[in-house]
């Protein structure tokens, strides 16, 4: 969606720019910042740290299941809140509001599309993942196809995407807001956020991440709704927004161009399939390809659903997340449009010199739409609340990325080199990798600082658009087509990556022209929208996967037990044999997964008493607790206990009452979603 920031946003060319001196309208956001605002921010940090400590103490942190999947004991409401906050980072507040300011409502369709895919996650994908007994998505592909090359490929690709797109986006956007609002040093503010974020991520694992995400979701939604009402009140509610947005033209413009004019279709989601900036077939079908990767196969999102205590709780989390994803259109996109309506000379600037003075970017200043609205409209105290909202968005998305990246590295990469690694070794490695990510994040700050904001968002969206469709095609075929084989899956991925990289190289070689410039890009770029390309790439990858699979030996039926949609309910006995043979990291490790609400301590306390541990210093005890290291040796489970544990962890049975409750809520959610699409179409 943020790709449209550059395409739709006000740009400027050096040719033909009027030379009269524009009024100095630099955004002095720090005016009026009060001690009460700082107090609110401090209180926010205290609450987050308190919740992080509470959940870290409560969590089972000494096992793979406890640290990476919260002991598979999470309820539906924190899962739903975490699904929301993991996706709505500070980058979404800045980028979504900025794109709304530049182009109107259409970008909100990206959020409403997520509702459908969240339900697909809970009803289609998660049942297969739980039945397969996996912790990571590459691990599922290894179980499904065998071999290691697909697992390693997916793990490395995901880590690269997390480090160089998601982390950079959130840090850039959060730092932009904090600098404008507080005037803090960039390194100091970002460093404090990263350290606080990393501490409770390392100490508490996924349970700490999910509970703090739930707190931050409440803060985000509450604060954003307050700003939304203040903004609508200022412009005269929705009719006033329609009138004032269409008149939001800056005083200094580029002659003989229309870049400074608001789009005539700004208040419509579904736009012309040929000339629209976000064509409706691409928004409905092409976006679904990208959203399937994001919501149904991406480790950051799926890991939250896998932590559910039952399939019904996973479904309930998807429903709650779907309801929450309806809101960003109203409390992010529309406030971005309100900001342009109120401040057309700043948010809607097109003169590159004026834009440079306002926000430091010559391509336009739509990125400042949300922070500008906060600093202009929010009263003392509430302004601090909104600063806390952006911090919450930044920290919640970073914790999600940190924990999921740690999971991928530990399970899919480290164990390739250390096959005999112990449970405690994996716990330490997972925590050390989070520290590594924090260091990389801090080193990435100067690169973000020197990057043009529009180009950065353009780059991130391009990377996602050209790498995600092959992954979507692979997972869909892996789950629904039993005939797909490992060679077909691998060579399909390689083909899709090659085609995607080719398009990406062309995109960067021929950047979109600024306002007033002649478009010299080849037709395949300027006339073939990236959402259309996503549909084509997904289809071509699927064709290659199927053709190569049909030319190779099919996978025996018995090896697909509980690994596809059609075999997810097969008896557990076959799964246990296969699990013991192919995934020793889960089934052969006694404390590898702990029952819902339980942990290593409970397992070790069963049976005979443990010998008294030798006394240790407070420093060593604190370090052992921080790293999740048990002071007493784990007691091995008997074969019968292992089988019972495996059955519980891979069960997709549901109580009829709660299954019906989830189904009814899903239908209601879809009805609301369809109504909104129709109303704003």
Swiss-Prot record:
Glycans are attached at residue 251. It comes from the Eukaryota. Residues 579-614 are annotated as: Disordered. Coiled coil: none annotated. Its main location: membrane. The chain crosses the membrane at residues 37-57, 76-98, 115-135, 158-178, 191-211, 218-238, 276-296, 318-338, 384-406, 428-448, 460-480, 488-508, 531-551, 661-681. GO terms for molecular function: D-glucose:sodium symporter activity; low-affinity D-glucose:sodium symporter activity. It is found in: Cell membrane. Expressed in the small intestine, kidney and liver. The modification Phosphoserine is found at residues 604-605. GO terms for biological process: hexose transmembrane transport. Keywords: Cell membrane, Glycoprotein, Ion transport, Membrane, Phosphoprotein, Sodium, Sodium transport, Sugar transport, Symport, Transmembrane, Transmembrane helix, Transport. The keyword Ion transport applies. Residues 58-75, 136-157, 212-217, 297-317, 407-427, 481-487, 552-660 are cytoplasmic. Belongs to the sodium:solute symporter (SSF) (TC 2.A.21) family. Electrogenic Na(+)-coupled sugar symporter that may play a primary role in D-mannose and possibly D-fructose and D-glucose transport at the plasma membrane. Transporter activity is driven by a transmembrane Na(+) electrochemical gradient set by the Na(+)/K(+) pump. Exclusively recognizes sugar substrates having a pyranose ring with an axial hydroxyl group on carbon 2. This is Sodium/glucose cotransporter 4. It comes from Homo sapiens (Human).
């Amino acid at each position: 969606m943020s790709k449209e920031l550059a395409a739709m946003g006000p740009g400027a060319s050096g040719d033909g720019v009027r030379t009269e001196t524009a009024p100095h309208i630099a955004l002095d956001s720090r005016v009026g910042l009060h001690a009460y605002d700082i107090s609110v921010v401090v209180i926010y940090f205290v609450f987050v740290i308190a919740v992080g400590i509470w959940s870290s103490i409560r969590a089972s942190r000494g096992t793979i299941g406890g640290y990476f999947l919260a002991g598979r004991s999470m309820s539906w409401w924190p899962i739903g809140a975490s699904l929301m906050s993991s996706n709505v980072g500070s980058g979404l507040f800045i980028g979504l509001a900025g794109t709304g300011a530049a182009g109107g409502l259409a970008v909100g369709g990206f959020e409403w599309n997520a509702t459908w895919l969240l339900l697909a996650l809970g009803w289609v994908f998660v049942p297969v993942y739980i039945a397969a007994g996996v912790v990571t998505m590459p691990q599922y592909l290894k179980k499904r196809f065998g071999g290691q090359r697909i697992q390693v490929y997916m793990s490395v690709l995901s880590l690269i995407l997390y480090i160089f797109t998601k982390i950079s986006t959130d840090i850039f956007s959060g730092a932009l807001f904090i600098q404008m609002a507080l005037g803090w040093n960039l390194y100091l503010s970002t460093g404090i956020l990263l350290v606080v974020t990393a501490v409770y991520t390392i100490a508490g694992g996924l349970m700490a991440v999910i509970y703090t995400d739930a707190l931050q979701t409440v803060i985000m939604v509450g604060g954003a709704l307050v700003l939304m009402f203040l903004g609508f009140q200022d412009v005269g509610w929705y009719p006033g927004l329609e009138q004032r947005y269409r008149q939001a033209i800056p005083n200094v413009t580029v002659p003989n161009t229309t870049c400074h004019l608001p789009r005539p279709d700004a208040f419509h989601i579904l736009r012309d399939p040929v000339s629209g900036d976000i064509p409706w077939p691409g928004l409905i079908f092409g976006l679904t390809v990208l959203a399937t990767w994001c919501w149904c196969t991406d480790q950051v999102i799926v890991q939250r659903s896998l932590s559910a205590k039952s399939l019904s709780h996973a479904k309930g989390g998807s429903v709650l997340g779907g309801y929450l994803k309806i809101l960003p259109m109203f409390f992010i996109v529309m406030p971005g449009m309100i900001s342009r309506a109120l401040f057309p000379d700043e948010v809607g600037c097109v003169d590159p010199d004026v834009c440079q003075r306002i926000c430091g970017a010559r391509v336009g200043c739509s990125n400042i739409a949300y922070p500008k609205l906060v600093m202009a409209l929010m009263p003392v105290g509430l302004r601090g609340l909104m600063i806390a909202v952006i911090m919450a968005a930044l920290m919640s998305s970073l914790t999600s990325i940190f924990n999921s990246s740690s999971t991928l590295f530990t399970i899919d990469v480290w164990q390739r080199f250390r096959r005999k690694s112990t449970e405690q070794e994996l716990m330490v490695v997972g925590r050390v990798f989070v520290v590594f990510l924090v260091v990389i994040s801090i080193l990435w700050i100067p690169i973000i600082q020197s990057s043009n904001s529009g180009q950065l968002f353009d780059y991130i969206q391009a990377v996602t658009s050209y790498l995600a469709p092959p992954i979507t095609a692979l997972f869909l075929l892996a789950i629904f087509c039993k005939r797909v084989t490992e060679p077909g899956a691998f060579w399909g991925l390689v083909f899709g990556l090659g085609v995607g990289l080719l398009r990406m190289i062309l995109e960067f070689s021929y950047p979109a022209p600024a306002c007033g410039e002649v478009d010299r890009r080849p037709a395949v770029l300027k006339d073939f929208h990236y959402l259309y390309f996503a549909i084509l790439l997904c289809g071509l990858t699927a064709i290659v996967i199927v053709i190569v699979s049909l030319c190779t030996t099919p996978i025996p039926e018995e090896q697909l037990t509980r690994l596809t949609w059609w075999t997810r309910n097969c008896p557990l006995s076959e799964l246990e044999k296969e699990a013991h043979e192919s995934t020793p990291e889960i089934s052969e490790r006694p404390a590898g997964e702990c029952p819902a609400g339980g942990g290593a301590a409970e397992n070790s306390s069963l049976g005979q008493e443990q010998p008294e541990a030798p006394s240790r210093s407070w420093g060593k005890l604190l370090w052992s607790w921080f790293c999740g290291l048990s002071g007493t040796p784990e007691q091995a489970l008997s074969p019968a206990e292992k089988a019972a544990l495996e059955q519980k962890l891979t069960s997709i049975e549901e109580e009829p009452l709660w299954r019906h409750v989830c189904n009814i809520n899903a239908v209601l959610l879809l009805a609301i979603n369809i109504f909104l699409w129709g109303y704003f179409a």
